[in-house]
């Protein structure tokens, strides 16, 4: 099992550098930095991390082909690959409709746009002159002035068609899920995409991009995950909620609690609205032994990399060290 860790660049650069170096020293293989317009620029932060780390692979988790051209993405991730000595990975997904609406971008044809963008980025990073007459993107001989080399591309996916696309075109898939049932459902579409491309599953990285919270005290770990889990529950599509047997009343209670938190500041009500069942479904939370048990279940469902996403734990530093000391050595 490979291990990744996600960070949001909502902190100062030196704080992010500290946590990523701590993760590297703790045995993590990958760090994924989120890419949102309202946070610090992902490639600026990745440049610092590339210079200050030695072994950890690093990249955006995830960027998108709407607010930045594939040509600029290829140049940016190619630069990170050069600076880091070949450690760059590119996470790219279709993005978030609500966020795009806030910045005046129309979210349309995500499958088509993703396919074209990934095909173009791969050609550019391999040093090719790109002639591409797509429905979305049209390139007429564009070429980077340097050759970054082969950079693994991971595609963020949830729905059946995007999962198939990720397996067909990508080196890995990033799936926002923490429960083995979600990966059992995804397996059929991943296998279909791999078969279409004539690729082996052994050469493909299936990533559980999970909410994780670890502490020696089980209750502290699980309570730290409640707010994050509330947002996941509120944003999950009906198919996912039905898959896990969550009642409409329970989900609506979480949504109402979040609304009260935003309007009245009642975040305690949000934590109370999240059931233990929801924590089990939408996060990997508990003691190191609890987390190991869940990761073993995910491995049986085809997962080959687990990403520790927010909140990581009640104390981020201690939780990273705990994962490195008591979880990673037992699963690698």
Curated annotation (Swiss-Prot):
Catalytic activity reads:
5-methyl-5,6,7,8-tetrahydromethanopterin + oxidized coenzyme F420-(gamma-L-Glu)(n) + H(+) = 5,10-methylenetetrahydromethanopterin + reduced coenzyme F420-(gamma-L-Glu)(n)
Q: Pfam families given for it?
A: Bac_luciferase
| UniProt xrefs under InterPro entries | F420-G6PD/mer (IPR050564), Luciferase-like_dom (IPR011251), Luciferase-like_sf (IPR036661), MeH4methanopterin_reductase (IPR019946)
Task: Name the EC number(s).
Answer: 1.5.98.2
User: What Gene Ontology terms describe where this protein resides (cellular component)?
Assistant: cytoplasm
Q: Domain of life here? A: Archaea
- Which Gene Ontology BP terms does the record give? lactate metabolic process; one-carbon metabolic process
Enumerate the Gene3D superfamilies for this protein: Luciferase-like domain (3.20.20.30)
| UniProt feature coiled coil, ranges | none
- Give the metabolic or biological pathway: Metabolic intermediate metabolism; lactate oxidation
Where in or outside the cell it occurs: the entry states: Cytoplasm
Keyword Chaperone attributed: no
Grouped into one coarse class, the protein's main location is cytoplasm
**What are the protein's UniProt keywords?**
Cytoplasm, One-carbon metabolism, Oxidoreductase
Work out whether the entry's keyword set contains Calcium: no
What would you give as a GO molecular function for this chain, any one? oxidoreductase activity, acting on paired donors, with incorporation or reduction of molecular oxygen
Q: Which family does it belong to?
A: Belongs to the mer family.
What's this protein's function?
Catalyzes the oxidation of methyl-H(4)MPT to methylene-H(4)MPT.
Name listed for the protein in its UniProt record: 5,10-methylenetetrahydromethanopterin reductase
Which gene holds the coding sequence for this protein? mer
């Amino acid at each position: 099992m490979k291990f990744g860790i996600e960070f949001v660049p909502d902190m100062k650069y030196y704080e992010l550098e500290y946590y990523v170096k701590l993760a590297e020293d703790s045995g993590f293989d990958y760090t994924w930095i989120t890419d949102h317009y309202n946070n610090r620029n992902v490639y600026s932060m990745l440049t610092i991390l590339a210079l200050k780390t030695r072994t950890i692979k690093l990249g955006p988790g995830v960027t998108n082909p709407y607010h930045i051209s594939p040509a600029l993405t290829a140049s940016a991730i190619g630069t990170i690959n050069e600076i880091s000595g070949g450690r760059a990975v590119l996470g790219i997904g279709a993005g978030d409709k609500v966020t795009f609406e806030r910045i005046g971008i129309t979210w349309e044809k995500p499958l088509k746009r993703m396919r074209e963008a990934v095909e173009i980025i791969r050609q550019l990073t391999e040093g090719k002159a790109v002639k591409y007459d797509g429905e979305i993107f049209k390139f007429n001989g564009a070429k980077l002035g340097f050759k970054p080399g082969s950079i693994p591309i991971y595609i963020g996916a949830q729905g059946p068609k995007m999962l198939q696309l990720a397996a067909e075109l990508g080196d890995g898939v990033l799936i926002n899920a923490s429960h083995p049932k979600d990966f059992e459902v995804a397996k059929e579409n991943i296998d279909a995409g791999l078969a279409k491309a004539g690729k082996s599953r052994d050469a493909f990285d299936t990533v559980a991009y999970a909410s994780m919270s670890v502490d020696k005290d089980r209750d502290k770990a699980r309570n730290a995950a409640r707010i994050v889990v509330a947002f996941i529950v509120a944003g999950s599509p009906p198919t996912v909620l039905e898959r896990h047997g969550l009642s409409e009343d329970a989900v609506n209670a979480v949504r109402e609690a979040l609304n009260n938190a935003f309007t009245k500041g009642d975040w305690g009500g949000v934590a109370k609205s999240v059931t233990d069942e929801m924590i089990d479904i939408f996060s990997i939370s508990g003691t190191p032994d609890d987390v190991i048990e869940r990761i073993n279940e995910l491995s049986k469902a085809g997962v080959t990399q687990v990403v520790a996403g927010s909140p990581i734990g009640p104390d981020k530093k201690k939780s990273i060290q705990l994962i490195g000391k008591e979880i990673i050595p037992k699963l690698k």
